[in-house]
Design a protein with these regions (language model features):
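Serine-hydrolase catalytic machinery in alpha/beta-hydrolase-like enzymes
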Residues: 1-68, 79, 153, 163
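Short alpha-helix in the alpha/beta-hydrolase fold that links the catalytic acid
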Residues: 14, 108-111, 120, 134-142
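Active-site nucleophile loop of the alpha/beta-hydrolase fold
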Residues: 31-32, 95-104, 127, 156
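Primarily recognizes the serine-hydrolase "nucleophile elbow" in alpha/beta-hydrolase
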Residues: 51-117
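Short beta-strand/loop motif that positions the catalytic acidic residue
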Residues: 118-119, 124-126, 130
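Acidic catalytic loop of the alpha/beta-hydrolase fold
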Residues: 128-133, 159-160
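Catalytic histidine-centered segment of alpha/beta-hydrolase-like enzymes
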Residues: 156-166
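C-terminal alpha-helix
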Residues: 170-178
Length: 179
Protein backbone atom coordinates (compact mmCIF):
# COMPACT_ATOMS: atom_id res chain seq x y z
CA UNK A 1 0.00 0.00 0.00
CA UNK A 2 1.42 3.33 -1.08
CA UNK A 3 0.65 6.56 0.78
CA UNK A 4 -0.63 9.86 -0.49
CA UNK A 5 1.76 12.72 -1.19
CA UNK A 6 1.30 14.32 2.23
CA UNK A 7 1.48 11.14 4.29
CA UNK A 8 3.72 8.19 4.97
CA UNK A 9 3.34 4.44 5.34
CA UNK A 10 1.78 4.85 8.79
CA UNK A 11 -1.33 6.62 7.44
CA UNK A 12 -4.30 5.33 9.43
CA UNK A 13 -6.26 4.13 6.40
CA UNK A 14 -3.32 2.22 4.92
CA UNK A 15 -2.53 0.47 8.18
CA UNK A 16 -6.21 -0.38 8.72
CA UNK A 17 -6.39 -2.02 5.30
CA UNK A 18 -3.06 -3.84 5.74
CA UNK A 19 -4.14 -5.17 9.14
CA UNK A 20 -7.53 -6.26 7.84
CA UNK A 21 -6.24 -8.44 5.01
CA UNK A 22 -4.22 -10.72 7.32
CA UNK A 23 -3.15 -13.47 6.93
CA UNK A 24 -2.39 -12.25 3.40
CA UNK A 25 0.96 -10.48 3.24
CA UNK A 26 0.57 -6.71 3.05
CA UNK A 27 3.21 -4.01 3.01
CA UNK A 28 2.84 -0.27 3.46
CA UNK A 29 5.86 1.60 2.11
CA UNK A 30 7.28 5.09 1.78
CA UNK A 31 8.35 6.73 -1.47
CA UNK A 32 12.00 7.82 -1.84
CA UNK A 33 11.24 11.50 -1.10
CA UNK A 34 9.71 10.56 2.24
CA UNK A 35 12.64 8.30 3.12
CA UNK A 36 14.96 11.23 2.35
CA UNK A 37 12.99 13.52 4.66
CA UNK A 38 11.66 15.70 1.85
CA UNK A 39 8.13 17.10 1.66
CA UNK A 40 7.66 17.39 -2.10
CA UNK A 41 6.67 14.12 -3.76
CA UNK A 42 8.85 12.41 -6.30
CA UNK A 43 8.19 12.85 -10.00
CA UNK A 44 6.16 10.02 -11.52
CA UNK A 45 9.10 8.06 -13.02
CA UNK A 46 10.84 7.88 -9.63
CA UNK A 47 7.63 7.00 -7.77
CA UNK A 48 6.61 4.36 -10.32
CA UNK A 49 10.09 2.81 -10.05
CA UNK A 50 9.63 2.69 -6.27
CA UNK A 51 6.32 0.85 -6.72
CA UNK A 52 8.09 -1.67 -8.98
CA UNK A 53 10.88 -2.14 -6.43
CA UNK A 54 8.45 -2.62 -3.53
CA UNK A 55 6.40 -5.11 -5.56
CA UNK A 56 9.53 -7.08 -6.45
CA UNK A 57 10.59 -7.15 -2.79
CA UNK A 58 7.18 -8.43 -1.68
CA UNK A 59 7.19 -11.11 -4.39
CA UNK A 60 10.62 -12.27 -3.21
CA UNK A 61 9.86 -12.08 0.52
CA UNK A 62 6.43 -13.73 0.35
CA UNK A 63 7.37 -16.26 -2.36
CA UNK A 64 4.39 -15.40 -4.53
CA UNK A 65 3.95 -14.82 -8.24
CA UNK A 66 3.93 -11.16 -9.29
CA UNK A 67 0.67 -11.69 -11.20
CA UNK A 68 -1.03 -12.56 -7.87
CA UNK A 69 -0.21 -9.22 -6.25
CA UNK A 70 -2.91 -6.68 -5.60
CA UNK A 71 -1.37 -3.25 -5.62
CA UNK A 72 -2.80 -0.01 -4.39
CA UNK A 73 -2.67 3.00 -2.24
CA UNK A 74 -4.21 6.26 -1.28
CA UNK A 75 -4.36 9.31 -3.55
CA UNK A 76 -0.87 9.89 -5.07
CA UNK A 77 0.20 6.39 -4.00
CA UNK A 78 -2.72 4.72 -5.72
CA UNK A 79 -2.14 6.76 -8.84
CA UNK A 80 1.52 5.69 -8.95
CA UNK A 81 0.50 2.04 -8.51
CA UNK A 82 -2.00 2.34 -11.36
CA UNK A 83 0.64 3.93 -13.58
CA UNK A 84 3.10 1.12 -12.77
CA UNK A 85 0.49 -1.46 -13.77
CA UNK A 86 -0.34 0.49 -16.94
CA UNK A 87 3.38 0.38 -17.78
CA UNK A 88 3.42 -3.42 -17.47
CA UNK A 89 3.87 -4.30 -13.79
CA UNK A 90 1.97 -7.59 -13.33
CA UNK A 91 -0.90 -7.50 -10.84
CA UNK A 92 -4.15 -9.28 -10.03
CA UNK A 93 -5.94 -6.05 -9.16
CA UNK A 94 -5.71 -2.45 -8.00
CA UNK A 95 -7.10 -0.84 -4.85
CA UNK A 96 -7.33 2.92 -5.37
CA UNK A 97 -8.37 4.86 -2.28
CA UNK A 98 -9.25 8.54 -2.80
CA UNK A 99 -7.83 8.44 -6.33
CA UNK A 100 -6.87 11.97 -7.47
CA UNK A 101 -8.79 12.11 -10.75
CA UNK A 102 -7.71 15.76 -11.19
CA UNK A 103 -6.25 18.54 -9.01
CA UNK A 104 -8.90 20.31 -6.89
CA UNK A 105 -10.70 22.95 -8.92
CA UNK A 106 -9.03 21.86 -12.18
CA UNK A 107 -11.24 19.17 -13.73
CA UNK A 108 -9.68 19.82 -17.13
CA UNK A 109 -6.34 18.41 -15.87
CA UNK A 110 -7.37 14.77 -15.75
CA UNK A 111 -4.98 12.09 -14.49
CA UNK A 112 -6.53 9.31 -16.51
CA UNK A 113 -4.38 9.00 -19.63
CA UNK A 114 -3.24 5.53 -18.53
CA UNK A 115 -6.70 4.13 -17.70
CA UNK A 116 -6.97 2.38 -21.08
CA UNK A 117 -4.05 0.11 -20.12
CA UNK A 118 -5.65 -1.11 -16.87
CA UNK A 119 -6.96 -4.48 -18.01
CA UNK A 120 -7.50 -5.91 -14.52
CA UNK A 121 -10.03 -5.53 -11.70
CA UNK A 122 -9.92 -2.08 -10.08
CA UNK A 123 -11.55 -0.98 -6.83
CA UNK A 124 -12.08 2.75 -6.28
CA UNK A 125 -13.11 3.96 -2.81
CA UNK A 126 -13.66 7.71 -2.50
CA UNK A 127 -15.62 10.35 -0.65
CA UNK A 128 -18.67 11.78 -2.37
CA UNK A 129 -17.38 15.31 -1.74
CA UNK A 130 -13.76 14.68 -2.73
CA UNK A 131 -12.45 17.79 -4.52
CA UNK A 132 -10.13 15.52 -6.53
CA UNK A 133 -13.09 13.94 -8.35
CA UNK A 134 -16.86 13.74 -8.00
CA UNK A 135 -18.96 10.61 -8.47
CA UNK A 136 -20.18 11.96 -11.83
CA UNK A 137 -16.63 12.66 -13.00
CA UNK A 138 -15.51 9.17 -11.99
CA UNK A 139 -18.45 7.52 -13.76
CA UNK A 140 -17.50 9.38 -16.92
CA UNK A 141 -13.79 8.48 -16.74
CA UNK A 142 -13.69 4.87 -15.49
CA UNK A 143 -15.37 3.63 -18.67
CA UNK A 144 -11.91 3.89 -20.26
CA UNK A 145 -10.70 1.04 -18.02
CA UNK A 146 -11.02 -2.27 -19.91
CA UNK A 147 -10.95 -4.35 -16.72
CA UNK A 148 -13.90 -4.54 -14.33
CA UNK A 149 -14.18 -1.45 -12.12
CA UNK A 150 -15.96 -1.20 -8.80
CA UNK A 151 -16.81 2.19 -7.28
CA UNK A 152 -17.63 2.58 -3.60
CA UNK A 153 -18.72 6.00 -2.33
CA UNK A 154 -18.40 7.15 1.26
CA UNK A 155 -19.65 10.24 3.04
CA UNK A 156 -17.00 12.91 3.21
CA UNK A 157 -14.17 14.31 1.16
CA UNK A 158 -10.64 13.26 0.24
CA UNK A 159 -9.92 11.70 3.64
CA UNK A 160 -13.32 10.40 4.81
CA UNK A 161 -13.49 10.74 8.59
CA UNK A 162 -14.02 7.67 10.75
CA UNK A 163 -14.24 5.46 7.67
CA UNK A 164 -11.19 3.23 8.11
CA UNK A 165 -13.21 0.22 9.25
CA UNK A 166 -15.64 0.59 6.34
CA UNK A 167 -12.79 1.04 3.86
CA UNK A 168 -10.92 -1.98 5.22
CA UNK A 169 -14.04 -4.16 5.11
CA UNK A 170 -14.75 -3.00 1.55
CA UNK A 171 -11.24 -3.98 0.47
CA UNK A 172 -11.44 -7.38 2.19
CA UNK A 173 -14.80 -8.13 0.54
CA UNK A 174 -13.52 -7.02 -2.86
CA UNK A 175 -10.38 -9.16 -2.52
CA UNK A 176 -12.56 -12.17 -1.70
CA UNK A 177 -14.44 -11.58 -4.96
CA UNK A 178 -11.20 -11.98 -6.93
CA UNK A 179 -10.62 -15.57 -5.86
Amino acid sequence: MAPGAGADRTHHTLTAVADSVAPLPAVCFDFPYRKAGKRAPDKAPVAVAAVRDEAAALVADAHIAARRLVLGGRSFGGRMCSMAVAEGLPAAGLVLLSYPLHPPGKPERLRTEHFGALDLPVLFVSGRKDPFGSPAEFEWEVVAIPGPSTMVWLDGGHDPRNADETIARTVVDWLASLR
